[in-house]
Amino acid sequence: MGIEDNKHVIKAFYEAGNRGDMDACFALLADDIKWTNIGSTKFSGTFVGKQVLTEQLLGPLFGQLKAGISSVVENMIAEGDFVVAQTAGTAETKDGKPYNNSYCQVIKVREGKIAEVKEYFDTELTSSVFGRD
C-alpha cells in the first residue's frame, strides 16, 4: 500500500470512531494490534490484540464516558508504513466532567490494517479527570 492509502485507513478509522461505529473501527485493526499509551495513567501501557485492547483499555475508558471521544484530525503526515496524526479529542465523563485532550499518534499500517499505535497525550489531564488508580 502507498502513503495515501495508509492515510486513508487512518482517516476511515477516525471517521468510524466519530460515528460510534466500533465494528468499522475494529475492522481496520490488525488482529495482533499493538497499542501503547505513554505515561503512567490508569490507561497507560501496551495492549496487544483486539481482545486485550478492548478489555484493558477501551472498555474501562469508554465505560467512564457518556459517549465516545470525538476526534478532529488537525494534521497528518506519512512516510513508508507510518502515519502520524495530530488530533484534538472531546468527550464528557458520565459525571459531567469535560475531557478534551490533544493527541499525537504514531501509527504503523500493515496490509491495510492498523498494526501498531503509539499514543502521546496530556497524561496529567487524563489523571486529573479519571483519577490515578
Question: Where are the predicted features?
Answer:
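Residues at secondary-structure transition points
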Residues: 1-4, 44, 48, 98
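A beta-strand edge to alpha-helix "cap/lid" segment located at domain peripheries
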Residues: 2, 58-133
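Short, mixed-charge, low-aromatic patches
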Residues: 8-18, 42-46, 60-65, 86
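Aromatic side chains
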Residues: 13-14, 35, 47, 99, ...
